[in-house]
Amino acid sequence: MPPDQRPVEFVSNNIIRQEFNRMQVEIRANLGELSKILSRNSHLAHPPEGIPYCTNSQIIYYYEQGNNLLAVAHQYLLPDGSLGGSGKPDPKRLVLSDRILAVRSAAPAHPNQV
């Protein structure tokens, strides 16, 4: 089913994280099985509490072969090069075969993958 015809199911952060982990999205990206594209990289002028100055807020798009969008995640890149929070990307959107999982704060869908 094309992504534009799949229903969107809004779920909790825990549910989307479980599915992201089950699908091994970050592991597959690190192995080169998925393309990982940095879509946004913004320096935080006023970082949230507990996040150091000079931290960047990043949106990452994960693509399967054939340029099919699989996932969208957010992460804080700390000044030392490590990731803030849990130390892992925070999934916001996950494209499954029959539906799209999303959290309400999700980044907008890629223009070609609405």
Label for each model-derived stretch:
Residues 2-114:
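Catalytic toxin/effector domains delivered as secreted proteins or via bacterial secretion systems
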